[in-house]
Amino acid sequence: QKKGFQSTALAQSVLAAAMNIEDLTPILPVVKEIGYKHCALQVLPEHYPIVGENLLAAIQEVVGIDENHPIIQTWAKAYGVIADAFIMVEKEIYEGMAWDGFKPFKVSKIETVTPDIKAFTVTSETQDLSQFTPGQYITVDIESEKLPYKAKRHYSIVDGGKDFLTFGVKRDVNEGHEGEVSTALHDEVHEGDTLYLSAPVGGFKIHHPERPQLFLGSGVGITPLISMYRQVAGDAVSAQMIHVAATETAAAFVPELEHITASGKNNHLHIHLRDREGYLEADELKMYLSDNTEVYVCGGTAFLQSMLKSLQALGVEQERVHFETFVPRLSVPV
């Protein structure tokens, strides 16, 4: 939010609706991706008029016009269309979620994975936690003495079973600014504590499991890919994982990746260390690709843009490339 991603995504959503006002079909996939985030945060239909009222008031203030101006009426119509689309999509998502709202879970284990990544395992005696699709994420609702409000953040599921879920959290430090929630989780949450989570959601998942699978994860972007790699390892024609890290110390979940790789003869793992090998380039990617490989990418914005550009240059069709971002998708220029 402090980096402006949320406001950019909202503006882009309304603009996209205005440009496709007669037929929203072209933007429905993006609407669904955003809808997953909304459902994770428990956004409800009654919240949309509140957002719309404040959005239109902001436009009036910035442009210097009143509420009866044709521009405001036009944007009100565009917002109404996009709000209705979100409400429709989110109704379906809510119906498929494993539980309603935020439920309490016990933190049974905290593991330091790298100097800035921790893995949190939560358990439940009453809730079946196996109902998730590899690639999905949970949402943590947390209170901290250092925060003036309750805060919610999404974290990708690394592993899960009937009575446990494990998710990874990177301490977010960017230009001297520490992420408030990730810092609270790292510094204030201990084994035995309680965390409140909403049910797993997300559309990042395996496509065409009968085809070769290639996973490209940089930094903490490896987290959703681990459960996806685990899902296909041993069964896929080929399952290849490339984990890009700045240094050997920064490489995350390596023992788990090695364990998964050992489960099948068609699995392959490469830990790409930038301090030794430089950036991952198209020439190296080329040897991991076949004519029908499904590719999954997750990492920071620069890594994501670089990989998508390289894959396009290598002739990989857009429909075979799947990616996840840790910021609102419409705020990422890809």
Located regions from the model:
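Globin-like tetrapyrrole-binding proteins
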Residues: Q1-F102
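FNR/FR-type flavoprotein reductase catalytic core
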Residues: S7, V51, E180-V334
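A short acidic, glycine/proline-enriched capping/turn motif at secondary-structure boundaries
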Residues: L41, D172-E175, G202
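Catalytic cores of large soluble enzymes that bind and process phosphate-bearing ligands
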Residues: V43, H47, E67, H177, ...
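Surface-exposed helix-capping loop/turn segments at secondary-structure junctions
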Residues: I65, L147, H207-H208
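Short, well-ordered, mixed-charge alpha-helical segments that flank or form enzyme active sites
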Residues: A85-F86, P115, V332
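Ferredoxin-reductase
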Residues: G96-T194, V244-E248, E258, R274-D275
